[in-house]
Amino acid sequence: MKRTSIFALGALLLASCGGNDANQDLVLNDLEYFERQGVNVLVYSNTFSGGFNDEKNSGIEIIHHGVRTVQGGAVRLSNTPEQWDLVPASPSRVVNKENKSIEVALRYNDYDFDSRVVVTAQGKAVEIAVYLDEPVPAELEGDAGFNLEFLPSQYWGKAYIMDGRPNRFPRYAVSNTITRPNSEKVKQYKGYKTYDDRGTDRFVDPLPLETGRSILIAPDEPSRMIKITSEDSDLMLYDGRMLAQNGWFVLRSILPAGKTGKVVSWIVEPNAIENWIREPNIGFSQVGYVPSQPKVAVIELDKKDKPLAKASIFKVNDDGSTKEVFSGKTNAWGDYFKYHYIKFDFTEVKEPGVYFIKYGEYVTNNFIINDDVYDKITDATSDVWIPIHMNHMFVNEAYRVWHGEPFKEGYLQAPPSTDHFDLHSQGPRTDTKYKALEHIPGLNVGGFFDAGDFDIETGSNIGVVQNFVTAWELFKPMRDETFVSQKQRYVDLHRPDGTPDILQYIDRKSTRLNSS
């Protein structure tokens, strides 16, 4: 039996499907992307228009045997763009079915710089070509280039061959870098410098891992193998993790100075495994089910897959053996974008125990049916997620320090009319007695970080404290697994201190809001 992963709520797992055999050419389909069996090439189906500039889900993308392994295909202004580096606007996108091409206009308003990227099907490959009607602006010469990014987790440890020279993608970020004067740094988001140069007035610039005109990526892994060649431009391979933990491997060609017309051309040929069909993706409750509730699994299928008429429920017995306890028919739900969906109702399974779903040769991981499955679902959030986000506190867990006491030096008054990155802004008036950039005493108390980083969103803190208060008023959760000492500015996870945790969380947020 094969084990298939669960379908997590809120996650959109993209995958590939195509024709009937490995000899099929890439075609431009009615959904306006190129496809063959096992390969999809998307051309600005997703644009650089999110709230965080470079969100690793834009530009030219490749979905390769069920995994989006490549993205970010665009004219960019640095070797390994970071989150707050400038991204191009895409004022137009033209799909030409007759020519089997998609053309996207790109523009950097800050530099009055326009380009066009044209992707055209050529057999099992696509040509990616960059066109310029005007030469690269002088201030961007040597910086403007065409980039394509590769997901590190899918390639590290795998081989690549550049112009016949064998090499391997590194597991860790270990390539070479240089530093350059800040005066040579291309402008970042809204003109801000989003890196810390430690007073050196220099920025870090990664050097390429390899350079050549032809690269075969992952020849040792057919599901990830891609051949890329260029007759007119050097291909330079970089490791974007040298500058950002969420950086990807980057293949890049510099746009030549002083030229117009077609200035860069790549031939990109992703390998396709013969008769590949994406495995079924079986969705069910990860929490489990109470005996009396409806129980319906949703099974997501490759459009080339043939739905099975039945699925089964197996129970895991006390001795570790398994037994089929229910078999029922599946029912068609319909198509949604790339996939076909069927449903499997097993509501009549009510006996408490450990179970899994079997669909054809695929089995899921386990789930539990019991009256108490919802009793502890908030414990991980309450015991770990919330306290590790406490600002202005040293947070410890056993032998691990999550973070020291942040922002001990306090905060400065933002200048009027300041539009900072990450949603922070100051209007034309400060409405305080403090001058621009003057230290404001007493602000470095309480509060919680924004999810995933170390800033504070006051609006979010207000919303969360309201939810905490509502939870306390309705349910009075008495769980106490967190030690909080305001005096010591110290938090220790999994250590009771005699006070319900939720009351301490309310106090943290209220203290912060009152100080503001």
Question: What is the role of each PLM region?
Answer:
Residues 276-292, 363-459, 463:
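An acidic-aromatic substrate-binding cleft motif
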